[in-house]
């Protein structure tokens, strides 16, 4: 599990296209400092497994399904990516619960800078809008953010996030422009609540739940 607090801006050092897959070598001296083979590292919000390590670099394999469902398909040598190691048991939740399982992609629709922050509007698929609430959590390219506004309907839906200078400087969202595709992961708690609601008509009740 991750927290959505980016530890490092990494750089794609190499991309090798395979049969319905791709292999990326990523430069990231901070996240590789204590990494081991088989560890999980979130790359732009996608949980990936380390398959090889070199000093300051790690390699991950990305299957075709992940490439199709995320913006990782757009990455090339030189691309900057947000990196975060899996949270240790003794770590703090600086953001919110992030699984690294991308629910879909959005497209930056507008970037509106102001003196102290920048408002970014993201066009989002209609299938994800039911999970978006004002002041709720959303993960954008692996960054834990608070939804500041929600609008539109269906596939014309959008949400806005307000980015402080630290976020702009320390993540790749600082370079986002209209048309940039970003990975989105909605709050997992919202998905569990929906699932429980849909199953509320089931006759069975788990032991200990509602027992008297």
What are these regions (language model features)?
Residues 1-212:
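Conserved loop->alpha-helix
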């Amino acid at each position: 599990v991750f927290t959505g607090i980016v530890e490092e801006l990494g750089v794609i050092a190499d991309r090798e296209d395979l049969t319905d897959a791709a292999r990326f070598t990523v430069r990231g001296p901070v996240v590789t400092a204590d990494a081991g083979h088989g560890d999980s590292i979130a790359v732009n919000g996608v949980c990936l497994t380390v398959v090889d390590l070199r000093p300051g670099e790690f390699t991950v394999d990305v299957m075709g399904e992940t490439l199709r469902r995320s913006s990782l398909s757009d990455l090339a040598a030189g691309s900057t990516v947000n990196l975060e190691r899996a949270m240790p048991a003794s770590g703090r939740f600086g953001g919110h619960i992030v699984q690294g399982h991308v629910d879909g992609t959005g497209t930056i629709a507008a970037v509106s800078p102001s003196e102290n922050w920048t408002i970014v509007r993201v066009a989002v698929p209609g299938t994800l809008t039911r999970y978006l609430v004002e002041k709720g959590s959303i993960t954008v390219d692996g960054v834990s953010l608070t939804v500041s506004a929600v609008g539109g309907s269906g596939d014309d839906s959008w949400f806005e996030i307000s980015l402080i200078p630290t976020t702009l400087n320390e993540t790749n969202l600082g370079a986002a422009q209209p048309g940039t595709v970003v990975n989105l992961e909605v709050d997992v708690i919202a998905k569990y609540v929906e699932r429980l609601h849909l199953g509320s008509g089931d006759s069975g009740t788990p032991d200990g739940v509602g027992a008297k």
